[in-house]
């Protein structure tokens, strides 16, 4: 179920009008079959694609009243709660999800993000450390921790994590500029330019890095 929901939301190829039409049809079907959880999950998906966070949250809540361990509903309700800035509720949903399925990177990173928004920096750091330990081959795990460390001005730690992320995804331009940004904050322009040159050698288009080359002058 959770995998199917990720695929569906990731595709999101329909136009807004098509999503609105889907909502209308699904409302009629739910009125006929109010106990059908699949229909409610489909409607919530459409609501999310229309950025109707409250409607989506309410559908996931209806699902969870019937099936309190429904992973798709827990995960995506947490996402909706985050969009609605209801961070404590989002945290509770992520924690409930992870209690059932602890080895889920996106949920762990979602929880870390919410903890940051709640001002719980130590807890957020612990969660990011846990993500890296559990997923040592994940670019996203290292990048998330590096972004947090950069925000906290922990630049040496951030550089290590940006390097680890780049080791796993050497042709990712966003990772390159993130590392370069930290080097420039430290006044290490020569190293920043060398990092850009290395990225170009790896196959990243130099034009995409022009702004950062200018900052290295």
Annotate each language-model stretch with its function:
Residues 1-8:
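Bacterial N-terminal signal peptides
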Residues 10-54, 58:
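N-terminal leader/linker segments that initiate helical-solenoid repeat arrays
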Residues 16-25, 51-62, 83-96, 118-130, ...:
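Structural signature of tandem alpha-helical TPR/SEL1-like repeats
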Residues 17-22, 181, 185-217:
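Terminal, low-structured helical/coil segments at or just beyond the last alpha-helical repeat
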Residues 37-38, 71-72, 105-106, 139-140, ...:
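Helix-start (N-cap) detector for alpha-helical repeat units in TPR-like alpha-solenoids
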Residues 48, 75-82, 116, 143, ...:
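Position-specific recognition of the canonical hydrophobic site in helix A of tetratricopeptide repeat
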């Amino acid at each position: 179920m959770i995998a199917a929901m990720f695929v569906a939301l990731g595709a999101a190829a329909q136009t807004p009008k098509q999503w609105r039409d889907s909502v209308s049809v699904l409302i009629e079907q739910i009125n006929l079959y109010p106990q059908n959880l699949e229909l409610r999950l489909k409607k919530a998906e459409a609501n999310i694609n229309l950025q109707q966070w409250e409607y989506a949250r309410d559908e996931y809540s209806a699902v969870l009243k019937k099936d309190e361990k429904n992973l798709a509903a827990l995960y995506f309700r947490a996402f909706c709660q985050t969009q609605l800035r209801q961070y404590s509720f989002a945290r509770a949903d992520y924690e409930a999800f992870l209690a059932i399925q602890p080895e889920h990177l996106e949920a762990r990173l979602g929880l870390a993000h919410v903890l940051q928004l709640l001002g719980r920096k130590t807890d957020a750091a612990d969660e990011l450390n846990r993500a890296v330990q559990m997923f040592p081959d994940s670019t996203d795990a290292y990048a998330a921790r590096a972004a947090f460390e950069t925000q906290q001005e922990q630049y040496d730690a951030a550089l290590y994590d940006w390097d680890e992320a780049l080791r796993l995804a050497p042709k990712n331009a966003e990772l390159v500029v993130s590392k370069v940004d930290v080097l420039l904050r430290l006044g290490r322009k020569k190293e920043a330019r060398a990092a850009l040159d290395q990225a170009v050698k790896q196959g990243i288009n130099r034009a995409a890095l022009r702004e950062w080359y200018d900052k290295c002058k």
